[in-house]
Amino acid sequence: MSIKDHLSISSEVRKALAGGRPVVALESTIITHGMPYPQNLEMVRRVEAVVRRNGAVPATIAIMDGKLRVGVKGEDLERLARGGGKAAKASRRDVAALLVLGGMAGTTVATTMMAAAWAGIQVFATGGIGGVHRGAETTFDISADLEELSQTQVAVVCAGAKSILDIPKTLETLETHGVPVLGYKTEDFPAFWARQSGQKVDHRIESAEEAARVIALQFELGMGGVLVANPIPESHAMDARAIEARIEEAIRCAEAEGVSRKDLTPFLLKRIFELTEGKSLIANIALVENNAAVAAEIATAMSELGAKSKSKSKAKA
């Protein structure tokens, strides 16, 4: 038995990959754990539309009916959105158990990367990656996303790490694991809702084509994933000091209620949504759409690079 027995790829995504067309993977914990129905369904449809408008095929990934689904759509997408309250949150450690036990799960950045790589998708758009939580020196709460980035050949386009995390420690961990952090038209690592964290990226890139060349060579050299940090649009960015005050309040609430481990991030995001009177969610949707557009452009550039490489190989032959 191989991974192919547990992977279900939609016909649209399969045809696109076979034809060398650009495909962008999308995660599903934002659907199952990020916002309520029907806003979650509206959001994913908007994000998929952004990917299409920018020339690529969207591939929303989730665990459903004992399969890792790549390219969830139609009635299944609505079922995923409606069932969010009952769905599990699947990281790397959960995949085998959830595939055997069945049920439905939203995939984290780590699991989405795994499924994308197995399917042959090289570019993935998300909101923000997980990372080192504040206080990790005592809780050891560090996301599996960072380890996955070090070993799986997928480029992740994001608005940095979620602001609720310890961003300096997250970047140090990425450095330890040899994960290159590329700033898309920026030298400052973005902080999800805020455009700047005060921390520097490893390398600034100016275009999707430039990003594609770096990513392609990274993979050709047999190295792991690449993080492309793309700041939230200025029109939707939140004030860094104001959001920090809300984050600190949300963390105090989590500590008071004993919330920890994989329940912590959804709890904090929900509490911050309440404290900002919904502004954080509006910003979240805007940054995901922005990342989807950039990811589609990078996927298109990588597809064109692949086509040129094949042409050169044929010419030499």
Curated annotation (Swiss-Prot):
It holds the Pfam family Indigoidine_A. Binds 1 Mn(2+) ion per subunit. Mn(2+) binds at residue 141. SUPFAM superfamilies: Indigoidine synthase A-like (SSF110581). Substrate binds at residues 89, 109, 143-145. Keywords: Glycosidase, Hydrolase, Lyase, Manganese, Metal-binding. GO terms for cellular component: cytoplasm. One of its GO terms (molecular function) is hydrolase activity, acting on glycosyl bonds. The keyword Lipid metabolism does not apply. GO terms for biological process: nucleobase catabolic process. The keyword Manganese applies. It catalyses: D-ribose 5-phosphate + uracil = psi-UMP + H2O. The active site is at residues 27, 162. Its EC number is 4.2.1.70. Its cofactor is Mn(2+). Belongs to the pseudouridine-5'-phosphate glycosidase family. Homotrimer. Catalyzes the reversible cleavage of pseudouridine 5'-phosphate (PsiMP) to ribose 5-phosphate and uracil. Functions biologically in the cleavage direction, as part of a pseudouridine degradation pathway. This is Pseudouridine-5'-phosphate glycosidase. The lineage of its organism: Bacteria, Pseudomonadati, Myxococcota, Polyangia, Polyangiales. The gene is psuG.
